[in-house]
Amino acid sequence: MFVKTFPRILKDEVWSKVLTLGMILFLILLADAILSFWVPNFIQDSLQSSFLMGLVISFSSVVGFGADLIFPQILRGFTVKRLILLGILSSFIFSAILLGATAAPYLVIFLLAMAVWGIYYELLGFGEQQFVADSTPLRLHSAAWGVMSIFRSLAYFLGPIIGGLLLARGDRTPAYFAILLTFLGLVFLMLAREKHKRPIEIDVHEVNLIRELAHWKVLFSHVWPIVIMSIFMGLVDATFWTTGAVWSHTLSERSWWGGMFLPLYTLPSLFVGFVVAKWQVFEGKKRLAEKFLFFSGIFLAMLGLTDAIFFQLLFVFVSSTLLAVSFPLTDGVYSDIVARMGRERRHLIGLSRSTISIAYIIGPAWAGFIASTIGERLTFSAVGITVVVVSAVLLLTTPKKLKLPQEEIKKWE
């Protein structure tokens, strides 16, 4: 069935664009995933502190949060292609700084690398949001995010595995390989000449952070359930890619299977993305995402019950499978609202991107602090219990429809 359907998909203009961007992002994010596995272990070994490691990685999101405020004001006329290109250039700089850090592992160099990392990630995020909102019809927003999440999840599944193999060949090898993959992504982007040329149609001539924060305040008062849910999903993700990377390495010292802890966190999105795309959920995305997040938190908390590798892998796989459904559903809600906002959509894109930055500002330092007191394994229990409580409250309080103040939005300049 898939063999017969695939040629028709390639001929479809919308899905052709989705698959093209997905392949480009796969190469870029595979490079990022390799570095994301290596960097927490490298920083923690260099600084000899899980808490300091968390603080350093949190700095990337402090910069990313600032980018969320500034980018909507300065991206006038930028195409998706140009945003991705700038992200690729930032990735090259990030890898180069990390190469320098292997020779001089000083705190200031780590902070500089994290600053570039924060900018790079936000550029890619703005590009993705703009692409889905403009290049796919409303009814396919969740499906588009589901398919793109497959490419993302494949990259982050393979990244830790490849990163572990590369690290065995030397400290610099992961960075060299990441540069090669990023270059391949650049080649694919240059070949996609006609697919991502539509510019962001905004008309802003100055950077006004106070005004942007005021816009966010207005939007938050109307879309707060989805913002809060995004933050806590981001906290889970931040925990896995900091404390989880260290815990995965610790388990791998006991057994080869232990090294699959972090890859199994990313694996479910490979097949869950197909399921979400097939559902084509049009209504009820918010509450459905909250329900899946609730049960994901339960299994995440169960990681603290035992350190047996079999149960560690089982619980993380089930928890991640449930969480993997929530992500594209939540992104679909954002895309629905973005499509209703007209030329002022950039403000909601900035707000949605800021939730990830906030999660990664709080998450690594919070997880690192907990890990320094009760250990990596129990850190997941603490995060899981928090997620269960928050998602339960959201299920009880989320309104059926998120309404925007359209008249007020029309007055924004």
Report each predicted region and the residues it spans.
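Juxtamembrane intracellular "pre-TM" segments in multi-pass secondary transporters
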Residues: 1-15, 194-226, 411-413
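Helix-loop boundary and gating motifs at the non-cytosolic
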Residues: 5-61, 222-261
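Helix-to-loop junctions at the C-terminal end of transmembrane segments
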Residues: 67-80, 167, 272-285, 371
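C-terminal ends and interior cores of transmembrane alpha-helices
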Residues: 90-104, 295-307
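Cytoplasmic helix-loop-helix junction between adjacent transmembrane helices
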Residues: 117-151
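Intracellular juxtamembrane helix-capping segments at the cytosolic ends
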Residues: 123-136, 326-340
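Symmetry-related core transmembrane helices of the 12-TM Major Facilitator Superfamily/SLC fold
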Residues: 174-191, 380-395
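C-terminal transmembrane helical hairpin of 12-TM major facilitator-type secondary transporters
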Residues: 286-328
